UniProtKB/Swiss-Prot annotation:
Tissue: Expressed in skeletal muscle (at protein level).
GO cellular component assignments: bicellular tight junction; caveola; lateral plasma membrane; membrane; plasma membrane; sarcolemma
Deletion consequences: Morpholino knockdown of the protein causes cardiac edema in 70% of the injected morphants. They show malformed myotendinous junction and, in 80% of the morphants, skeletal muscle is characterized by myofibrillar misalignment and fiber detachment.
Transmembrane annotation, as ranges: 39-59, 61-81, 83-103
Record's protein name: Popeye domain-containing protein 1
Amino acid sequence: MSNTTSALPSSVPAVSLDPNATLCQDWEQSHHLLFHLANLSLGLGFLIPTTLALHMIFLRLLLMTGCSLFIAWATLYRCTLDVMVWNVVFLLVNFMHFFFLLYKRRPIKIDRELKSVYKRMFEPLHVREALFQRLTGQFCTIQTLKKGQVYAAEDKTSVDERLSILLKGKMKVSYRGHFLHNIYTNAFIDSPEFRSTQMNRGERFQVTIAAEENCKLLCWSRERLTYFLESESFLNEVFRYLIGKDITNKLYSLNDPTLSDKAVKKMDRQPSLCSQLSMMQMRNSMASTSDTDDVLNQILRGGSTGSSLQKNPLTKTSTTMKPIEEGLEDDVFESESPTTSQNVSKTTKKDI
């Protein structure tokens, strides 16, 4: 029986394994240490958090390290040309990107005369050095004025030409020979006029601006600066904020011309009573008119706000906003009448 069963052909064919087949029979030994170090550097590069400031630079460094180790492993221990060529290509690409990142982070050297303006006005608003250099390097000039020279003449100089910041010195603003306020270092010279030209073109200065000391100015071409700010939305918002703040400082110094340089820089003082009254008149005038830009122009031109608005027939009173009552402040300057003095004496007698 056993002989017959052994003579029968087997129904299951024998499996013949080709040594070139994909199924692994004998695993090769582990590769050299360089191979593992190369993969480790690639893995560390991909694990760097993106919140890190130098994330891209560290990533490129680790990728270049991994490619270099792969090149050494393929050349010295495996002798595989294709692996070596591909990693050389990857190494060159990463090196070019790494060099570009270093070039972008190079220190920008700002001119010594402009450094104080950048530190005081633009750096607190997160304007980078490269953007500030573009702003000051293309279409602006540094001009000098000697003591007594006029920057703008009343009713003569056009306001459409330039926008300037005072870098050094001190300037005086006057209207028809009457002193209005001073302009100190790191402040716009003609910010109110720049604001007014955005609404009305072809106007002239309504004040005279002259140098009280030897001055240095940073001047932009008005037209070219406007085109540049249209393409840089962030910088446009920065300029709007700086000019608005400068106009506010000029309003305070206009109401209190005795402000010193330190007081203008700090602007944390409480206005005096006279300053509060004049500011109250300005706010009443702006609250009782519908066109606040016209009121602002009239204020900055040096005229009396209340009288100019009363004489102007074009101003319309607002139905939604009422002027602020000034009765309490006006009582401070009123002299005592006989009736009030008698009432006061009666109350004192009763108290006694």
